[in-house]
Amino acid sequence: VKYDDVMLALFSFKTDKQWQIQLPESPANKPIFVPLTELKQADNVHLAIGHYQDEFELGSVTLDYSKITPINLGNPEHEMLFVAPFVVANQGSGNFWYLGLFRLNNQTADIRHIDSLLLGDRIKLNTIDIIDPLNVSQLKLSYWQHGEQQAMAQTPNQLVEQNIAVSLTGLTQITH
């Protein structure tokens, strides 16, 4: 049996099962799953990367595994719920950042992609924090996005702080 490098390195699971990201914009009746197949490190960023082809479109999914954040919901003896940021890039000009919600089954080494929340195009993510350790159902994200008068080629300069509600079934942006 050839073990999956990503699952072995990130979760110490000796399994041939792959961690697959469901493309957020893929149709519900024909979802596209992209297996994360390679690990890379550059400039203190730790990435798991997968590539896909959908008919004529080529693209990639890149997940920042250094920002995996466990969520203490559900049954920790059998599963771990966690969030992780990932970016979808295709032949267009955008790099669309999402926050993904995942469930790792400790017995079967299956990772299920439960939900995704769009954060923005070409943002620079700072932090993902649990707001209150006693109430793990809320996260606070901090990231830089492009201002209205700013070219996308420039470094984003507008700081955004966003609160996100987490449940066993999904992610919801909290508006003030």
Can you say where each PLM-predicted feature lies in the sequence?
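Short aromatic loop motif centered on NTY/YTY
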Residues: 108-167, 172-176
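Beta-propeller blade termini
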Residues: 62-75, 127-134
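Short glycine/acidic-enriched loop and turn motifs that connect beta-strands
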Residues: 88-92, 146-149
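Acidic/hydrophobic-patterned starts of short beta strands in beta-sheet-rich repeat architectures
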Residues: 72-87, 135-142
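His-enriched metal-coordination microenvironments in redox/metal-binding proteins
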Residues: 89-96, 120-122
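Terminal domain-start segments
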Residues: 1-70, 174-176
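Beta-propeller blade repeat segments, especially FG-GAP/WD-type strand-to-loop junctions
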Residues: 94-114
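Short, solvent-exposed loop/turn segments at conserved positions within beta-propeller repeat blades
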Residues: 39, 92-96, 152-159
